[in-house]
Curated annotation (Swiss-Prot):
PANTHER family in the cross-refs: UPF0250 PROTEIN YBED
Protein name (record): UPF0250 protein HCH_05838
Gene3D superfamilies listed in its UniProt record: 3.30.70.260
Disulfide bonds: none
InterPro entries registered for this protein in UniProt: UPF0250_YbeD-like (IPR007454), YbeD-like_sf (IPR027471)
One Pfam family this sequence matches: DUF493
Annotated source species: Hahella chejuensis (strain KCTC 2396)
Family that this chain belongs to: Belongs to the UPF0250 family.
GO annotation, cellular component aspect: cytosol
Length: 91
């Protein structure tokens, strides 16, 4: 089997799953993201968010982890985050 044919590593659920959300900096961006995340992970603690402004202050990067239950759980959260107009990228 070549490197290109190797399967991606399997994630064992439930697990702590790190996320990074980048969006347009605004007074409520962090709270909007926390609200979306809480809809999928009610135990999420918004005080665990690590926020970093871009050099020019236009964007805000939020890093945090959730307790992911399945690949579908992560996929639904990604879709809801990406659907918000202020969110530019979800990693």
């Amino acid at each position: 089997m070549t490197d290109s044919q190797k399967e991606a590593p399997k994630i064992e659920f439930p697990c702590d799953y790190p996320l990074k959300v980048i969006g347009v900096a605004g007074p409520d961006f962090q709270e909007v993201v926390a609200t979306i995340v809480r809809a999928h992970a009610p135990e999420f603690d918004a005080s665990s968010i690590d926020a970093l402004d871009s050099r020019n202050g236009k964007y805000l990067s939020l890093r945090f982890s959730i307790q992911a239950q399945s690949e579908e759980h992560i996929r639904r959260l990604f879709l809801d985050l990406k659907a918000h107009s202020a969110v530019q990228m979800v990693l």
